[in-house]
Curated annotation (Swiss-Prot):
It comes from the Bacteria. Residues 429-433 are annotated as: G2. Residues 395-564 form the tr-type G domain. This is Translation initiation factor IF-2.
């Protein structure tokens, strides 16, 4: 055959040149497109391709599925059909040629060993037969010799007796005895030797026979090969197993492969299950035992449990908190034993009560176990430590919080700085949640936080002070220091934040700057010109006077503080405000402290977590990142976080979810522990207090800060007689769930800047619920006060309506002593309660029984007129006494 090139061969076999070159290379032949190919090289390539692709499969798997229906009896005599499906799988593996050769060699060696053993057994049997024949011949010769010796001895004795008649009978008897003893010893020695030889021959023959039988058995039984794997029918019901057996007999009955046929053959090695229904029944019977109390031998399937001989000491892992029931489970004891141990230690507890780590450690060690204390925030610490926080710190913009009393012009001042109209959008002209803004000035950027000035927003203002670098205290020049001004000073001092005082409304005629300085100096805010540290800047939010000086003072104070932050790396910050938007979901206003917050980052925020889906600045514009001191609104959290929560960017969303769930569980445990503690502490107070009226409220507001402020204000209204109870609160509109909760708890639905949806209004109309909307917190508090006032029991007041002087006393057979009186003040009315005064001391308190004027009964007697008064059940009336008539009136109480 002539040689062809690679190209020609590729076109001939209809494949690409590159693939053919690669196949030659795999076969170990290096060729190019223009090289020629010899017949030998073609044969080499063909052999390689057959070995790679033409080989038969090494393994073949057969699967079979059969279905059947089984009717089983049920309750009430009804039968129930159960669908049974049996799946079988058999795998046949092709032997490797080398493996086949090895198995053949092993079989040949085994046959040779068996043949050698058989020959050795035959030779041993022949030797044993020969030895036996020799022994029998020797014994026969010995017996003949013994008989001959006896006959000769008898003849000698006869001759000797004839020749020696004079021998005595005693000598003959002695000689006979010695001869008998010698013969007996010889016979015993011969029998012992013969017995040993027979036993040795029998043992050798038995061993040879046993080896031959084992070899024959191993030769006749085919060894188990991997060609057929064991099929397991694992069922979970007696009926299913029975149906499986019946189905096998129907399908494979002619071929003898049913389960009962399998049971007749020896069981395969390694089969862990019973091969037939009979085997399973036998195993169950062995476990149950026979009739009449005669139990069979214990089965291997029967579980044997023995009580421990002594107490088992365990390693008990205890977290920061644990319930009594969980502690008992960890120690493998009953909960009552743990409660007894705690009672011995002087602590009372229930099985579901949460106990602290120290108490659990004492109880576990008292019961003899080893305690391993575990910190439950290890996961949280690990997540927080796995953060790229950057290295180099750069200067950042100051975060400035504007504080002050209500209506002192905080928002108007910031409004002028930002050149926008924020104040006009606030209900009632007051700020009701924190606004975060950053403004660009000629000297740099400043971030402003505008906090409400109303007393109800104390917690919001406290959060603002914690997140800020500088506090601008706005004081009206015409109003001076007010309660919220003092509170703002306290917050700033508690947070150790420097103060810059902006004296607003300086353009008013009644403005008095010195008065403001004097009043603030009483609370530790000293002006710089007086030797203090606070800068006083007179400004006017309307005219714009002193605004530039205020900004310069803020930047100067920031320069002194040397504010720096890491710009690169994973961000961290704080939640300034949060609310639930109907279209966007949970929204949180975040102030970034360090790092850069990017869109798509995974954030952990208190009890919530999520991926930042979108970020907007205070103008509502989309941004992709936010650096230090920049406030942004983020979307994508799992829920509405609490205002003031820490915001941290983490790497793994799964771990962030685990930390958030752990925090939720921890908060719940702490809350339950606190409730339990308050129940124990207030036990006697709850036993002694009378009936207390409650005003139940379901509160919904637009932002989280408003919910907190309103809740705090309403809870402070509670008195000993009427208590305000917030049944439910949240952020967002009033839903059907809120209305149902209010109906179940007889509560008032309060919506602050939110409205009820259609489904909620249906429930409200059907249940006739009290729904109220508010946009100003003053109105809400006033109406709740009015509702509480209606629940107060009225105050009873005694009002004196008349006073009469006793001028004379005379007797009446019907009423006893009658006092003749002159009305000196007011009006005396019949059947009213009276007091009898003697020397201005009350000596009797009772009721008027009779009131007459001139013999006529009258209902009242006016001032300056005489009358006769009969006092009920009292006769010790004297001249000069004063009779005071009064009435009890009810005065409706109010909540101050």
């Amino acid at each position: 055959m002539t040689d062809v090139t690679i190209k020609a061969l590729a076109s001939e076999i209809q494949t690409s040149v590159d693939r053919l070159i690669q196949q030659f290379a795999d076969a170990g032949i290096r060729k190019s497109a223009d090289d020629s190919v010899t017949a030998q090289e073609k044969q080499t390539l063909l052999t390689h391709l057959n070995r790679e692709h033409g080989s038969a499969p090494d393994k073949l798997t057969l699967q079979r599925k059969t279905r059947s229906t089984l009717n089983i009896p049920g309750t009430g005599g009804k039968s129930k059909s159960v669908q049974i499906e049996v799946r079988k799988k058999r795998t046949f593996v092709k032997r490797d040629p080398q493996e086949a050769e090895r198995l053949a060699a092993e079989e040949q060696a085994q046959r040779e060993a068996e043949e050698q053993a058989r020959r050795e057994a035959e030779e041993a049997a022949k030797r044993e037969a020969q030895l036996k024949a020799e022994r029998e011949a020797a014994e026969q010769a010995k017996r003949e010799l013994a008989d001959k010796a006896k006959r000769e001895a008898a003849e000698k004795d006869k001759v000797s007796n004839q020749q020696t008649d004079d021998m005595t009978k005693t000598a003959q008897a002695e000689k006979q005895r010695r001869e008998n003893e010698a013969a007996e010893l010889k016979r015993k020695s011969e029998e012992e030797a013969r017995r040993k030889l027979e036993e040795e021959a029998r043992r050798v023959a038995e061993e040879a026979r046993r080896m031959a039988q084992e070899n024959e058995k191993n030769w006749t039984e085919a060894p188990e090969t991997p060609e057929e794997t064991t099929d397991y029918h694992v069922t979970t019901s007696q009926h299913a197993r029975q149906a499986e057996d019946d189905n096998d007999r129907e399908v494979e009955g002619g071929r003898g492969r049913g389960r009962n046929a399998k049971a007749a053959r020896p069981a395969k090695k390694g089969n862990k299950h019973a091969e037939s229904k009979a085997d399973r029944e036998e195993a169950r019977a062995a476990v149950r035992g026979g009739k009449g109390g005669k139990h069979r031998k214990g089965s291997a399937l029967q579980q044997g449990f023995q009580k421990p001989a002594q107490a088992v000491n365990r390693d008990v892992i205890i977290g920061e908190t644990i319930t009594v029931g969980d502690l008992a489970n960890k120690m493998a004891v009953k909960g009552s034993q743990v409660i007894k141990a705690m009672m011995k230690l002087g602590a009372m507890a229930t099985i579901n009560q949460v106990i602290d780590q120290e108490t659990a450690q004492l109880v576990a060690e008292e019961m003899g176990h080893k305690v391993i204390l575990r910190r439950e925030n290890e996961l949280e610490e690990a997540v927080m430590s796995d953060r790229d926080t950057g290295a180099a710190a750069e200067p950042r913009a100051p975060v400035v919080t504007i504080m002050g009393h209500v209506d002192h012009g905080k928002t108007s001042l910031l409004d002028y700085i930002r050149s926008t109209k924020v104040a006009s959008g606030e209900a009632g002209g007051i700020t009701q949640h924190i606004g975060a803004y950053h403004v660009e000035t000629d000297n740099g950027m400043i971030t402003f936080l505008d906090t409400p000035g109303h007393a109800a927003f104390t917690s919001m203002r406290a959060r603002g002070a914690q997140a800020t670098d500088i506090v601008v205290l706005v004081v009206a020049a015409d109003d001076g220091v007010m309660p919220q001004t003092i509170e703002a000073i306290q917050h700033a001092k508690a947070a150790q934040v420097p103060l810059v005082v902006a004296v607003n409304k300086i353009d008013k005629p009644e403005a008095d700057l010195d008065r403001v300085k004097n009043e603030l100096s009483q609370y530790g805010v000293m002006p710089e010109e007086w030797g203090g540290e606070a800068q006083f800047i007179p400004v006017s939010a309307k005219a714009g006077t002193g605004i530039d000086d205020l900004l310069n003072a803020i930047l100067l104070q920031a320069e002194v503080l040397e504010l720096k932050a890491v710009r690169n790396g994973m961000a961290s910050g704080a939640v300034i405000e949060s609310f639930l938007d109907k279209g966007r979901g949970p929204v949180a206003t975040v102030l970034v402290r360090e790092g850069t917050l990017h869109k798509g980052d995974i954030v952990l925020c208190g009890f919530e977590y999520g991926r930042v889906r979108a970020m907007r600045n205070e103008l509502g514009q989309e941004v992709l990142e936010a650096g230090p001191s920049i406030p942004v609104e983020i979307l994508g959290l799992s829920g509405v976080p609490a205002a003031g929560d820490e915001v941290t960017v983490v790497r793994d969303e799964k771990k962030a979810r685990e930390v958030a769930l752990y925090r939720q569980g921890k908060f719940r445990e702490v809350k339950l522990a606190r409730q339990q503690k308050s129940k124990l502490e207030n036990m006697f107070a709850n036993m002694t207090e009378g009936e207390v009226h409650e005003v139940n409220i379901v509160l919904k507001a637009d932002v989280q800060g408003s919910v907190e402020a309103i809740s705090d204000s309403l809870l402070k209204l509670s008195t000993d007689e009427v208590k305000v109870k917030i049944i439910g609160s949240g952020v967002g509109g009033i839903t059907e769930t809120d209305a149902t909760l209010a109906a179940a708890s007889n509560a008032i639905l309060v919506g602050f800047n939110v409205r009820a949806d259609a489904s909620a209004r249906k429930v409200i109309d059907a249940e006739s619920l009290d729904l109220r909307y508010y946009s100003v917190i003053y109105h809400l508090i006033d109406e709740v006060k009015a509702a509480m006032s209606g629940m107060l029991s009225p105050e009873l007041k005694q009002q004196i309506i008349g006073l009469a002087e006793v001028r004379d006393v005379f007797k009446s057979p019907k009423f006893g002593a009658i006092a003749g009186c002159m009305v000196t003040e007011g009006t005396i009315k019949r059947h009213n309660p009276i007091r009898v005064l003697r020397d201005n001391v009350v000596i009797y308190e009772g009721e008027l029984e009779s009131l007459r004027r001139f013999k006529d009964d009258v209902n009242e007697v006016r001032n300056g007129m005489e009358c006769g008064i009969g006092v009920k059940n009292y006769n010790d009336v004297r001249v000069g006494d004063m009779i005071e008539v009064f009435e009890i009136i009810e005065i409706q109480r109010t909540i101050d």
